Amino acid sequence: MNLYALSVNHRANPLGINSDEQPYFGWKLKSEKPNTMQAAYRLRIYADDTVCFDSGRVETACNAFVCGPDLLRPQTFYRWAVTVWDNHGENTTAESSFETSLSSKEWKADWMRTPRAYVQRKKGFGTQPPATLFRRAFTLSAAPRRARLYATCLGVYRLTVNGKRPDMREFAPEHTSYKGLLCFQTYDLTALLHIGENVLGMEVGDGWYCCPQTQPPIDGLQPDHTVLFQLEIENADGTHTRICSDEGVLTHESAVRASDIFDGELYDARLALPGWDMPGFTAADWLPAVKDTKQSDSVLYPQFDDPVICVKELPAQCVYTSPKGETIVDFGQVVAGRARVTVDLPTGAAVTLEHFEAVDAKGNYFNNIDSAMGITEQKDVFISDGTPQTFEARFTFHGFRYLRVSGVENPIAAQFVAVVLSTEKTNAGTFECSNADLNRLYQNTRWSQCANMLSIPTDCPQREKAGWTGDISLYAKTALLNEDVTPFLTQWLQSLCVDQRENGSIPFTVPDVSIYHYAGIQMGEQTGCGGPVCSAGWGDAAVTVPMAMYEVTGNTCILEKQYDSMKGWCDYVISRARIHAPNSTLPDEVEEHLWDTGFQFGEWLVPSLAGAPQEQLFTTMATTSAYTTPIFGWLVVHKMAQAAAVLGREEDAVRYQEEADKMKHAIRAALITADGVLRYERQGAYVLMLVFGLVPDAWVDKFGTKLAEIIHANGDRLDTGFLPTPYLLDALCIGGQRELAYTLLYQTESPSWLAQVKRGATTIWESWEMYQPDGTPKKESFNHYTYGTVDDWMFRTIGGIDQEDTGYRRLMIHPQPDKSLTWAKRSFETENGTVYVSWKREGGQFILTADIPCNTTARIILPDGTQHTVGSGHYTLNC
């Protein structure tokens, strides 16, 4: 037996965790012996080789989210060791490490701001002020033994130390709810510092904080480039040196003449200052930074998740001339990131790179990013200094597959690279089967997840780049089945807590940014609901995201951390349910527990309701919200009861379950007729009632048959919007219509998943149909992950891996393929290790192979109904 994948806060050897919060630990077991289970563990933590925490021997199989000491010392390197005993009498020990960050009480640095006069930002390319160079020189008289830098800014920054980047992170300090949460980063600079002069350099662009669409909704805010950093050095001679952002910080305009997180970046190489962040540079004409006394250290928090980095580089597939004479570069894949170009141009010559997702019907440039915010240009411009250079923007990113290029004569594909950006995450799963279209659908989901998990979970990486709560509320489970997003979602949920209102309601987007904050107020005024408003299915993220994390990984720590926030939203939902709908004829005891008032999005983007004039939007939302609102209201209260029970909050568990039961009764009374049919003959209504168990047992098959009739009447095509689609195929299976579920999965006529694949999609689209009849793309996003939730169904039903307990500790391996599929493979990295299942039809037999990790049991069900209960090990079974 051996141990691997040791982690603290779900990260390997993390640098700079919060010393004020209880850390959690994890490890995994490997053993050649079958049926291996952990019997006990002992966790020890060392500081300066002295044991500061010892759990003693703990008799449990738990090996993930194991809580450590309540408090740790700040700025301290810790070594930790875990000893594990298994059920075969063996034991082994493994070690790892972590380090705590600067505590909130230890900040001595000053906020230092650019000295230029404030420039109000306006939307549009090139309208922003230049990025700012912040330079802090200092001298060391002794060699550093240990050096840690803690840094952040208002805007986004790129750090250099003596001209070198300590890591390759992008967009630090990233996107959070700035009014109450600003992350800082921890860097190990030990190897980058030396005796003599040293220079810290921070180049700061506008980022999210200074952008008019995404700046925090704070009255009177005048956002501009501001830095805060503190360098703590332990010298080899035993002395200590501290270097802070202070009056010694000098500033200068950058060669980045304008940068906007949406519209793009303008860079003039003629204005670059080579060596500005190196010792020996003359900064005589630089201006001192100005101390900003308005900023507070109270919002500072050490970054919990991993950084945004380049996760992949894609070479251009081809360069062609469009019918309009444009130079078009095709990378073959829709991504989030930016383009890199290598050129050799005369001084003053400019290269323009316009990023876009889809060409028009004839292959010309087409800007599909047009919204209430106006047209987003997604443009980067590079002005040459006359030397050969490789250009890549620094403080922006785009959603694109294509470039329209101006200013490069006779370009070739080798000059262009697509730099794919995303938050760094560990892959957690794979899927492949005999149907190539389903494989492409799976890959499309993975690409959309990559693009929309850049600092925060977004709806799209080009038009809005916003943390729409509804998207991640629905997609969180699928995300966890694809990648380790535990640190990522933990960080985002912290912003959700900051933005949650006093009454418990949740904004449309987290972080709550200006454009959607004020849109929420406006929507409230337009609908007479007051504002800012929220919606069922969207605000639910406060409950559904932490619950998805718990259900997939067994993470009880996140339930503890988010518990008050979860209760806040549920109590808000219950308070809304108490408000009776105008002109309601329902009995008071029903209305009292039915959420059917207020602003609501409803299903959202139902195909048969798509394309309606703007003035009909609220009408179509009301049509479907009549059932989505009470159903999703019940769902979060039901899940809240489950969370309370898991944490041993018995009084809360009883209270919320009693309310959920009353809501369930009210939903049945309001939505189901005496004849056993729904008052709303829509696919989405039947889907939600079936999948959440809201249908009386005696009527389940009847509801399944009715749902099938509605689908058949629609040409065997789906007609579900945003909220019901993730549950569509499961609802059909519950209602005894598995064959129809496969029919919908394989459907190639729009609206359907494979219609997109057949149309050449490389990501998941915002709407089911993204092209006009003449082939012209719609002005919508080609990169939204939410409809990719179908992957979850494929993983379970085709791949065969499901769970019978939280955290996949007890597996159910039960492939249920239709006759057209001949083989499939699925792997998933659980908290215990890798589960791998493959099956194939060969020679009249169904042959299944399974690898079960240690600390796990599985019930394997073959297509003929044969069942096998097994422990860890390798198995081959057939029928």
Spans of features found by a protein language model:
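Active-site acid/base region of carbohydrate-active enzymes
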Residues: 156, 226-228, 246-253, 412-443, ...
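C-terminal capping/lid segments that line or modulate ligand- or cofactor-binding pockets
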Residues: 200, 267-268, 464-467, 474, ...
